[in-house]
């Protein structure tokens, strides 16, 4: 398992992450298959989109069907018929966000089982045991997760505890065919983030994750933390910003120097009939304006949905038939994968500034319609100040 940097452009890198089941081209977006399956998409469809890696949730798989059963089935790859790479999270985030009764002490995380109601303990060693049974290519350490807006001594305490838990995870990690990423914590405090990055870098072998973001913080804080962490981390390891999935966030973070991302957003937003498009950002297909719009979601998209179905058809079934969610999910995942492909090409060709200008101009422009008179507005929306500041930090200029 190794990471090769193939090209650089400003802060950004384009690389190949060599894993047991596939070579993953970075920057990369990882779709989320919560319990070993994507919402409304089968593995064969992901292969047809050239998806090389996806994320599965240790917390959910540990409860259903259970890691012992997954191991007995031959591991997660075999059970879900997926012969490409998998990354599993540690389960810590879900315990904090989903459990009504949750406490953390030096031993680990104590939480209420969603199935039995009994209190359970998850020490770092148990998290690694479960992930090794699942058999993912990349595992995550158990970290002390706190809300991103938390302030005070607990932020520093959680950061130092995450470092100590990493050391325990390293002792429990016995499989050479599985990589393990540390998770960088420190809240919105840039000095704590830099301190944590220094300690995690001493221990990391394959890659490092930037955790504790995308939880409701202001975007101006978000991008500055990502930029500071990327600058502080070793240049030879991939940097994984956890929980990032909005297209603008993916683009900005990639050009700040991040390499890996994951989020449920593409499939979650599809359930509400929302399609992701380059021009206009989001297309609300449940709106009446699409009732007689016989264009595909995106003329330039090569996904099966855009090749075969119209906006009008999807409008007629979204929210009524499960196939509506399926069709939009297929498009949204392909949209994200294609976006990251274009980001990689921009880095490879050293055309980041040109790409940024075109992407942002399109994204904040009006959605193309079969009948322009039906568009809500022909005016371009304002590019957020945080985006402009991040682009300026990269050394590029927007002329609109």
From Swiss-Prot:
- Any one Gene Ontology molecular-function term assigned to this protein's record: tRNA-guanosine(34) queuine transglycosylase activity
Q: Which residues form the active site?
A: 89 (proton acceptor), 262 (nucleophile)
Catalytic activity, reaction form? guanosine(34) in tRNA + queuine = queuosine(34) in tRNA + guanine
> Which residues does the annotation say bind substrate?
89-93, 143, 185, 212
Q: Which locations, inside or outside the cell, does it occupy?
A: Cytoplasm
Task: Give the top-rank taxon of the lineage listed in the UniProt record for this protein.
Answer: Eukaryota
GO terms, biological process: tRNA-guanine transglycosylation
Residue span of region RNA binding: 243-249, 267-271
Keywords in alphabetical order, please: Cytoplasm, Glycosyltransferase, Metal-binding, Transferase, tRNA processing, Zinc
Q: What is its main location?
A: cytoplasm
Q: What is its EC number?
A: 2.4.2.64
Q: Which cofactor does it need?
A: Zn(2+)
Q: Which residues bind Zn(2+)?
A: 301, 303, 306, 331
Output the Gene Ontology cellular-component terms. Answer: cytoplasm
What HAMAP family does the database record attribute to this sequence? Q_tRNA_Tgt
Q: Which family does it belong to?
A: Belongs to the queuine tRNA-ribosyltransferase family.
What the protein does comes down to:
Catalytic subunit of the queuine tRNA-ribosyltransferase (TGT) that catalyzes the base-exchange of a guanine (G) residue with queuine (Q) at position 34 (anticodon wobble position) in tRNAs with GU(N) anticodons (tRNA-Asp, -Asn, -His and -Tyr), resulting in the hypermodified nucleoside queuosine (7-(((4,5-cis-dihydroxy-2-cyclopenten-1-yl)amino)methyl)-7-deazaguanosine). Catalysis occurs through a double-displacement mechanism. The nucleophile active site attacks the C1' of nucleotide 34 to detach the guanine base from the RNA, forming a covalent enzyme-RNA intermediate.
Subunit structure, interactors included:
Heterodimer of a catalytic subunit and an accessory subunit.
Name listed for the protein in its UniProt record = Queuine tRNA-ribosyltransferase catalytic subunit
Q: What is the lineage of its organism?
A: Eukaryota, Metazoa, Ecdysozoa, Nematoda, Chromadorea
